[in-house]
Amino acid sequence: MEYRVLGLSGLRVSAIGLGCMGMSHAYGAPADRKEMTELFALAVDMGYTFFDTAEVYGTNTNPHDNEELLGDALKPFRDKIVIATKFGLTFDKSSECGPYPLIPNSKPKSIRLAVEGSLARLKTDHLDLYYQHRIDPQVEPEEVADTMAYLIKEGKVLHWGISEAGEDYIRRAHKVCPITVSYTHLRAHETRHD
């Protein structure tokens, strides 16, 4: 396995990471937990160090299933791996039954609650990389970045990133608290990217 350092952060990750969304969200029924636990152990043995999840990767009955799965399966390897998870989307449970739509929520109080939930579910005392999953048009980037600076100072988050944001948003947030990663969806088979 090859490894990379993300930007100037010093955060070293495997060149290939394991995105975990499909294990319990979006692509049919959740995968078998025992099989996924074995897969995680195999991935670590192969040199994978970067594992990506989000607080909203789950099912209607267990909306945080993916983080719980990672927390259980990767606990024995915690000192060897980098865990990335995401905040900024919440389930709109105003209807009585799911599937529940996701709505952006990056208010500081929501971020603080989200980080505590992710830490508990992932069975860790810190998050290596914490992404803003989607931009909340009701919250200024400086307010989000200020909250991240606070969480970094507390040691709960080591690095942070932003997913699917425009240049102006990234620049404004970065001025307040330096961003390690800008997460963009690219597909290897596409030859042209905007």
Describe the role of every protein-language-model region.
Residues V13-G17, T49-F50, K80-A84, H126-L129, ...:
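Structural preference for beta-strand elements that scaffold enzyme active sites
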Residues M21, V56, K86-T90, Q132-I135, ...:
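Active-site beta-loop-alpha junctions enriched in small/polar residues
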Residues L119-D136:
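Active-site groove signature of glycoside hydrolases
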Residues T184-H193:
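Conserved small/polar residues in nucleotide/adenosyl-binding loops
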